[in-house]
Regions:
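Short conserved segment of the HATPase_c
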Residues: 48-60
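Glycine-rich ATP-lid/hinge loop adjacent to the conserved G-boxes
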Residues: 61-71, 100-101
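Acidic ATP/Mg2+-coordinating residue in the GHKL
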Residues: 43
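Short beta-strand/loop element within the Bergerat-fold HATPase_c
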Residues: 23-35
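Short helix-loop "hinge" at the ATP-lid/N-box region of the Bergerat-fold HATPase_c
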Residues: 16-17
């Protein structure tokens, strides 16, 4: 089971790469918070439609603009969620915005956070 966590991070980073254009930045960082470690993957792609933020973790969810970003089976994030939860962790997605109060603005990219117990 431990080796499967690598699959999660490879999937999240691969997704970030597929949604960015040549030369765009992808950030990966780790922070310890209380009894968890947070692993954060951020991209500078188009972000995620607000109504899709929870749906992206459903099996075969495909109502994303994959046609312009390459093929997608709709399984990667669902499998990642199962693996993270099997380790007692959580995973979520959010959009990066200029400020937290600026909900109406266009996203500056997407952020995926994996929280795992330490």
């Amino acid at each position: 089971l431990e080796g499967r966590l690598a699959q999660v991070f490879v999937n999240l980073i691969s997704n970030a790469i597929s949604f960015c254009e040549e030369g765009d930045a992808i950030r990966v960082w780790v922070r310890k918070r209380e009894n968890r470690v947070l692993v954060v993957i951020e991209d500078t792609g188009p972000g995620i439609p607000e109504d899709a933020l929870q749906k992206v973790f459903q099996r075969f969810y495909s109502e994303r603009p994959e046609t312009q970003f390459g093929d997608n089976s709709g399984l990667g994030l669902a499998i990642s969620k199962q693996i993270v939860e099997a380790h007692g962790g959580v995973i979520w997605a959010e959009n990066i915005r200029p400020t937290d109060a600026d909900i109406g603005s266009e996203p500056l990219g997407a952020r995926f956070v994996v929280g795992l117990p330490v």
